[in-house]
Amino acid sequence: MKNILIVGAGFSGAVLARELADRGGWKIRVIDSRDHIGGNCHTEREKSTGVMVHKYGPHIFHTDREDVWEYVQRFGEFRPFINRVKASIKKGVFGLPVNLHTINQFFGKNLSPQEAKEFLKTVGDDGIQEPANFEEQALKFLGRDLYEAFFEGYTLKQWGCSPTELPASILKRLPVRFNYNDSYYNSRHQGMPVDGYTAVIESIFDHPKISVELGTEWNETMKKGHDHVFFTGPIDQFFGYSEGRLAYRTVFWERKEAEGDYQGNAVINYPEKDVPYTRVHEHKHFAPWEEHEKTVVFTEFSKETEEGDIPYYPKRLAVDMKLYESYREQAQKASGVSFLGRLATYRYMDMHQVIGEAMDFSTKVLEAEGGGQDWPLFSGE
């Protein structure tokens, strides 16, 4: 029987732990530096309002993978939830992503889907042949009015740099729907866990061969006594930031309680430059089957990650990817350790991607062990 150490008690660590314990019969020790499980997906019910709060920002579960959808439902009840994001600007409140209703409302028109496609061609900048950055990509396909209303200021606030400094690949495809579908996601399955994400992860960890230790920092001496370490934290942290820190954006919130209904929607974006925050979350709307007299609202701000901050969004600019490659080279020389999850592989990942990748990674580990081969070094490869 293998003795395994997993660093990190979020979805990556939890799913890997469960799969290796269930299918491999291995003994799993999980540690996390925080005082709770769940990582940034952590949810808790507030005493003062009774509302289930997403402590590190809103998380809406959505996936097209049937096996992932079935997997999470093994560990908790999910109810249907469609995230309908609004954008508040001086001109009014509009639906996001930009859809047919947004276009007609914004331009004061009554266009059909085909007419809207033709209309956007007339307002888009056809002088841009090969977009070199985010701004040019948006101007080419959306035109200046929609770009400035919904994308320019929000991007500047979220990423802390000009949209001209960001790669065009961020807008890989036209971010417009030529219908009245105002669901933020297109995924087949969308839902919210009735008892919160932390309860789901707690259920995943509920196995006789899994132990979880909170408030426990990782250090190299912990390798002793374990056959292998799976690290789900920041890869630059694992190597002591020896090459420098990978760049992330982080977020912070101003919390406010109110009576009744504060904004009438779970998430409202504020894309204009002169508004310092990016969006406002009203958490009771993430559980519309519940009723609460009070409400709790979080106003979200974005900033560059500094020492001690929780990393959220990897910037992944050219200089960052070069730095990440240097850490990957160090990882190739390390022994007895593998890396998985968004922080360890320096990627932005949604929950369903994290879970699916951990499921796939566990299969690769077990198959490698069964075949007498080297275990995989990185997830997602």
Regions found by a protein language model. Name each.
Residues 23, 216-330:
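Mid-domain catalytic core of redox enzymes
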Residues 41-44, 98-100, 226, 293, ...:
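Short aromatic-enriched loop/helix-cap "lid" or pocket-rim segments at secondary-structure transitions
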Residues 45, 281-381:
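Conserved flavin/dinucleotide-binding core of flavoenzymes
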Residues 90-94, 100-228, 239:
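Active-site/ligand-binding neighborhood in enzyme catalytic cores
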Residues 21-47:
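Glycine-rich FAD pyrophosphate-binding loop
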Residues 2-30:
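N-terminal Rossmann-like FAD-binding beta1-loop-alpha1 element of flavoenzymes
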Residues 49-123:
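Dinucleotide-binding Rossmann-like beta1-alpha1 core, especially the glycine-rich loop
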Residues 28, 210-214, 337:
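Generic structural signal for residues in well-ordered beta-strands
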